């Protein structure tokens, strides 16, 4: 059962609902949103008198297994990263090198991606690599470099966290925590990120269904963190021509099933620099709320994923195209009701 409370609901109403759940030995999870509203997910049904208190605005008895992530009880969520809003109607571009290579190199990249149109800086301080011999990142030193780049450019920072024990330290430096595809079902990490005050970027696993992806988000939400952004980053397929297959079907479907913002990673999703721009535009056309793109001043010299990394000039071109597609879609939404003879 999902119970939605209005922003002005009395504190006593929440207490009554939780007490009713406890009396029936039902587990209840409360998720508070920045606007003051709240959602309570209960593992069972409550009696009618527990749901008639002031401020109860909606009750759902039938719902998806991902109670808190489900769209049924809430409109589009907007997640704030620094001063940037994801899901607020304007596509957001996160960009930067795959891995932090050094302070000066990162600041150069940060300045370049900001000039190109990015509003959030990405960069890995801790890198999960397929080979144990590959560069694993600079660790806390890399986090310090990211914080320095934020100070210089004003861009908020998103970076990956690999283990539950790293969450607090990474949260000290970063504005947003990223949970990568390999860790999508690392449940201790999901729970720990759910207890953080930082927003979380949750990438879809290589072989995960959309429902499994949303259930992973539910782990974070169930711990009290409402600020989750989903990221489609490509799934495994049979064609060796691509590193992964970017599953753009998942974008409108995830937005249909969930209120959480959805962004797309066309860099990992294709593995090919030449396809990043085209798939970025396609992602926005499919309804994505933003993009996360690997960009480097000199991709050929990048320490990680150079073959899928673009230049700042290419990023600027992508940002222009993304804006054009967004404007076209907004115009289409305005004229569609008129063409159909409906009231606007």
Predicted ranges, named:
Residues 6, 138, 154-165, 175-188, ...:
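Catalytic beta/alpha-barrel core
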Residues 92-97, 119-123, 157-160, 175-179, ...:
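Hydrophobic faces of well-ordered beta-strands that scaffold small-molecule active sites
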């Amino acid at each position: 059962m999902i119970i939605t409370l209005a922003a002005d609901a009395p504190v006593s109403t929440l207490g009554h609902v939780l007490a009713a759940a406890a009396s029936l030995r039902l587990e209840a999870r409360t998720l508070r949103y920045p606007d003051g509203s709240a959602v309570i997910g209960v593992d069972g049904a409550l009696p009618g008198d527990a749901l008639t208190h002031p401020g109860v605005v909606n009750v759902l008895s039938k719902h998806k297994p991902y109670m808190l992530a489900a769209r049924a009880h809430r409109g589009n969520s907007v997640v704030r990263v620094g001063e940037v809003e994801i899901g607020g109607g304007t596509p957001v571009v996160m960009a930067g090198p795959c891995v932090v290579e050094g302070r000066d190199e990162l600041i150069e990249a940060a300045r370049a991606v900001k000039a190109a149109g990015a509003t959030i800086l990405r960069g890995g301080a801790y890198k999960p690599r397929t080979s144990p011999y590959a560069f694993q990142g600079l660790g806390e030193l890399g986090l310090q470099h990211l914080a320095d780049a934020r100070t210089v450019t004003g861009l908020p920072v998103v970076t990956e966290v690999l283990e539950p024990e790293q969450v607090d330290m990474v949260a000290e430096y970063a504005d947003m925590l990223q949970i990568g595809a390999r860790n999508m079902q690392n449940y201790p990490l999901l729970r720990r990120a759910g207890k953080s005050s930082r927003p979380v970027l949750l990438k879809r696993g290589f072989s995960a269904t959309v429902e499994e992806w949303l259930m992973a988000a539910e782990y974070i939400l169930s711990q009290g963190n409402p600020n989750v952004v989903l990221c489609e980053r490509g799934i495994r397929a049979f064609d060796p021509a691509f590193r992964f297959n970017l599953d753009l079907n998942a974008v409108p479907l995830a937005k249909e099933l969930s209120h959480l913002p959805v962004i797309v990673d066309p860099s990992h999703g294709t593995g090919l620099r030449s396809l990043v721009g085209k798939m970025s535009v396609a992602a926005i056309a499919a309804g994505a709320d933003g993009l996360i793109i690997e960009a480097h001043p000199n991709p050929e010299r990048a320490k990680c994923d150079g073959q899928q990394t673009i230049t700042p000039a290419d990023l600027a071109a992508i940002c222009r195209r993304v804006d054009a597609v967004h404007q076209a879609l907004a115009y289409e939404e305005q004229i569609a009701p008129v063409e159909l003879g409906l009231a606007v």
